[in-house]
Amino acid sequence: ESKLTLTNNIKFDQASALDASVSGFLGLEHSSRKVLVGGSTHDPEETVLLQTYQAVKKHCPQLLLVLVPRHPERFETVARLIHKSGLAMTQSASANSVSDDCDVLLVNEMGKLNAVYTVADFAFVGGSIADRGGHNALEPAARKLPVMMGPNTYNNPVICAKLAESGALFIVEDAAAMTELTLSWCKNADAAALAGLAGYTVLEQNSGALDKTMKVVELYNN
């Protein structure tokens, strides 16, 4: 007799359980600026995001780019990259707020991504233009954000497929594609909100794996 029972992916529960009390980052929750977050980025993704920012800013001057590198040992490298671009930068570890003339906020602290997503309007999830398989797209989806990733999503193929099918996740291969999509969201807030809501709905519909798994374990142990 088969004892195989299928439950949902526990990652949906982990994203649903993100601390709802975490809200705000450096006062950006009170800002009217549009915020594009590059979360868990690797080389060359910061370069792609900086190119995107420079192109979109011509049409959306209030846009703020927030970069959250995956590895702390790259903080200084990314800071030099931003400086070289000529854009005005703030580094979070030494800031209490973000001025209106700041172009790029570099989050040079660990453990801040969840808070950063609460002040974002759009998100790019890293490790996906860089060939790292892609990081967790459910984290921004839990904050009702429209999500972009590169083509490398093999770490979480089912999750990414569900988000893409729902209209919440969009694949961008380069700065040109990222620019086009970001600009469309800047111009059409309703479309961005709809995409974000679609991702949140996927998350809600697929949660409960942990509860189901524990019930199955309990059943087989009795």
PLM-predicted stretches and their roles:
Residues 1-222:
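Nucleotide-activated sugar donor-binding and catalytic core shared by glycosyltransferases
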